[in-house]
């Protein structure tokens, strides 16, 4: 393996110029410099400022593509992934940021990819507050990988780090309207083995930023239902109960007593109690 491998970074974006620029700035601050960033704009109606910003950077590592037709987040992710030239690859959402050491932290654990599907790390969460250092933000610690947990819910998050050829082999499912990350991570785990968790927090998840959210509730339900039908043969009885309970929560549909008794488990019972308490 090369000591200074090229890392490809893919970023889909749509009508969030200021947030996308913030994400790009966090990539530019990386303490590891051998990367390329492929930004695919999914036919935004407002995009000139973002294009001008990238052009003014005059950084050959950054490529900006504005599509003439809106094709959806998964399609533009795949478009960027197939253009990637790096040995390794990872993604960034246009409303998130990286800590300066994200790429170097992942590279320090790259040997784990020989026996693991991908790497993932903890995150920080920002709910709009002003901060000077990421470490001052609340930590979003992720669970160490376990099949029992992962087959019930996405414990990985929204981004992973792995060999580029693995993403090119799997790609995102353009038919899914929700759970797209969960879907590709699950397929990678089935194909390449368990993932490896890195303990450092290297990403800042921004929530409640006031801009348009990409997934609406009806799409989320139909997409998650599609995801469940696609993978239900992989799930054991406990995982199926958990997944079906999730579908009822997404749809916000009242369960009959018969359905409730059918899906009842210790974990679902706790979720039900938390819901009643408004947590």
UniProtKB/Swiss-Prot annotation:
Pathway membership: Slime biogenesis; slime polysaccharide biosynthesis
GO process terms (BP): colanic acid biosynthetic process; lipopolysaccharide biosynthetic process; slime layer polysaccharide biosynthetic process
Keywords of this entry: Lipopolysaccharide biosynthesis, Transferase
Residue ranges the record marks as coiled coil: none
Any Pfam family the entry gives: Glycos_transf_2
GO molecular function annotations of the record: glucuronosyltransferase activity; glycosyltransferase activity
UniProt-listed SUPFAM superfamilies: Nucleotide-diphospho-sugar transferases (SSF53448)
Taxonomy, superkingdom: Bacteria
Family statement drawn from the similarity comment of this UniProt entry: To R.meliloti ExoO.
NCBIfam families assigned to the protein according to its UniProt record, in alphabetical order: PRK10018.1, WcaA
PANTHER family registered for this protein in UniProt: GLYCOSYLTRANSFERASE (PTHR22916), UDP-GLCNAC:BETAGAL BETA-1,3-N-ACETYLGLUCOSAMINYLTRANSFERASE-LIKE PROTEIN 1 (PTHR22916:SF3)
Protein name: Putative colanic acid biosynthesis glycosyl transferase WcaA
Organism from which the protein derives: Escherichia coli (strain K12)
This protein's encoding gene: wcaA
């Amino acid at each position: 393996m090369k000591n200074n491998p090229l890392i490809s970074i893919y970023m889909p974006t749509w009508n969030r110029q200021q947030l996308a620029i913030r994400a790009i700035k966090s990539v530019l601050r990386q303490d590891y410099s051998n990367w390329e960033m492929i930004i695919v704009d999914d036919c935004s109606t407002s995009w000139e400022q973002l294009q001008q910003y990238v052009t003014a950077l005059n950084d050959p590592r950054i490529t900006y593509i504005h599509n003439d037709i809106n094709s959806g987040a998964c399609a533009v992710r795949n478009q960027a992934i197939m253009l990637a030239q790096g040995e390794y690859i990872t993604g960034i959402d246009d409303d998130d940021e990286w800590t300066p050491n994200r790429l170097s932290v992942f590279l320090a654990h790259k040997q784990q990819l020989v026996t693991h599907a991908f790497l993932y790390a903890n995150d920080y969460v920002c709910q709009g507050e002003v901060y000077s250092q990421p470490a001052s933000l609340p930590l979003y610690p992720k669970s160490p990988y376990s099949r029992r947990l992962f087959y019930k819910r996405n414990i990985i998050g929204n981004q992973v780090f792995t060999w580029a050829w693995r993403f090119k082999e799997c790609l995102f499912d353009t038919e899914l309207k929700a759970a797209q990350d969960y879907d590709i991570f699950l397929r990678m785990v089935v194909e390449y083995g368990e993932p490896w968790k890195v303990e450092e927090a290297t990403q800042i998840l921004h929530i409640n930023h006031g801009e348009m959210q990409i997934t609406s509730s009806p799409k989320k339900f139909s997409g998650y239902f599609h995801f469940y039908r696609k993978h239900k043969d992989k799930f054991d009885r406990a995982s199926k109960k958990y997944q079906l309970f999730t579908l009822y929560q997404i749809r916000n549909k009242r369960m009959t007593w018969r359905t409730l008794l059918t899906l009842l488990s210790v974990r679902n019972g706790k979720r039900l109690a938390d819901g009643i308490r408004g947590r």
